[in-house]
């Protein structure tokens, strides 16, 4: 009897091992099939990306003359880009008082994708003759490399004699005395371009993204921002007055 039980136990163990081997084989087969499906999806995604790029390239060509026409009209509006820049909720805080003096000479802004779109883009600020620097335009270029990194280059600013990066601005304190508070100039966005390892690079890249994807696409939204805010504030005041009236009525009812 003992021998029979031992023999039976070995048979059961062998059967379990065969079942495990079968399960393992089925699992491997399922994973292989899943990988094949994922490979098919990857091919479709790559094809879709290529076609999206082709469409983007096509419409970049179509947009170009429209952007040129828009630029012509913008140049007839004094201080357009400075106003749009200052009215932007994120970009407006980046300009020091000294930067704003320079921005008065900004007469056009241009964002241009690389011809194949995927290689990168450039942002160019065009200035009229000014007392700060010699350059008629300042360009910052973002080149997307194959290894996944981004190469950033920018126009070295040729400051005029006695001029340079605005490092601070005078503020009046409570005693009426002026004191210098350090503020980073927006123009460090150009001068820091070569220092990719610098901790500020993420902020600078974010600035480029905002200019490219938001400000450039519809600057009129921000140029008109002050008027919109006034309208909005007016509505808020009306709502607050209405709420106060309601509160007064409730208090009177309570007293009765």
Curated annotation (Swiss-Prot):
Name the chain's protein. NAP1-related protein 1
Function comment: Acts as a histone H2A/H2B chaperone in nucleosome assembly, playing a critical role for the correct expression of genes involved in root proliferation and patterning. Required with NRP2 for the maintenance of cell proliferation and differentiation in postembryonic root growth. Involved in both intramolecular and intermolecular somatic homologous recombination.
Keywords, in A-Z order:
Chaperone, Coiled coil, Cytoplasm, Nucleus
Alphabetized PANTHER family for the sequence: TESTIS-SPECIFIC Y-ENCODED PROTEIN
Gene3D superfamilies to which the protein is assigned, alphabetical: 1.20.5.1500, Nucleosome assembly protein
How is the subunit organization of this protein annotated in UniProt?
Can form homomeric and heteromeric protein complexes with NRP2. Binds histones H2A and H2B and associates with chromatin in vivo.
The main location is cytoplasm
Q: List the gene name.
A: NRP1
Q: What else is known?
A: Double mutant nrp1-nrp2 shows arrest of cell cycle progression at G2/M and disordered cellular organization occurred in root tips resulting in a short-root phenotype. Double mutant nrp1-nrp2 also displays hypersensitive response to DNA damage and impaired somatic homologous recombination.
Give me the stretches of Acidic residues compositional bias: 226-256
UniProt family annotation: Belongs to the nucleosome assembly protein (NAP) family.
Q: Name one GO cellular component term.
A: nucleus
Residue span of region Disordered: 220-256
* Domain comment, as recorded: The acidic domain is probably involved in the interaction with histones.
Q: Which SUPFAM superfamilies match?
A: NAP-like
- What phenotype has been reported when the gene encoding this protein is knocked out? No visible phenotype.
Give the domain of life. Answer: Eukaryota
Annotated organism of origin = Arabidopsis thaliana
GO biological process terms, alphabetically, are: double-strand break repair via homologous recombination; nucleosome assembly; somatic cell DNA recombination
- Please list the tissues where expression of this protein has been recorded: Ubiquitous.
Q: Where in the cell is it found?
A: Cytoplasm; Nucleus
Coiled-coil region(s) at which residues? 23-64
Q: Name one Pfam family in it.
A: NAP
Q: Which GO terms describe its molecular function?
A: chromatin binding; histone binding
């Amino acid at each position: 009897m003992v021998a029979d039980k031992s023999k039976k136990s070995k048979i059961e163990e062998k059967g379990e091992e065969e079942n495990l081997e079968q399960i393992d084989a089925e699992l491997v087969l399922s994973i292989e099939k899943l990988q094949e499906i994922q490979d098919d999806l990857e091919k479709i995604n790559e094809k879709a990306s290529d076609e999206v790029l082709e469409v983007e390239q096509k419409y970049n060509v179509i947009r170009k003359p429209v952007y040129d026409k828009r630029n012509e009209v913008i140049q007839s509006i004094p201080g357009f880009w400075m106003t749009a820049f200052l009215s932007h909720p994120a970009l407006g805080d980046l300009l020091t008082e000294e930067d704003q003096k320079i921005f008065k000479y900004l007469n056009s802004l241009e964002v241009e994708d690389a011809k194949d779109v995927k290689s990168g883009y450039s942002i160019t600020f065009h200035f009229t003759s000014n007392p700060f620097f010699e350059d008629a335009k300042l360009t910052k270029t973002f080149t997307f490399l194959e290894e996944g990194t981004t190469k950033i280059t920018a126009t070295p600013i040729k400051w005029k004699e006695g001029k340079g990066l605005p490092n601070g601005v005078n503020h009046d304190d409570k005693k009426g005395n002026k004191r210098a508070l350090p503020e980073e100039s927006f123009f460090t966005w150009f001068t820091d371009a070569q220092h990719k390892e610098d901790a500020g690079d993420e902020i600078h890249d974010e600035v480029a993204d905002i200019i490219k994807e938001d400000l450039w696409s519809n600057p009129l939204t921000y140029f008109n921002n002050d008027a919109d805010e006034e309208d909005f504030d007016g509505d808020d005041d009306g709502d607050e007055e209405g709420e106060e009236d309601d509160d007064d009525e409730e208090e009177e009812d309570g007293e009765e």
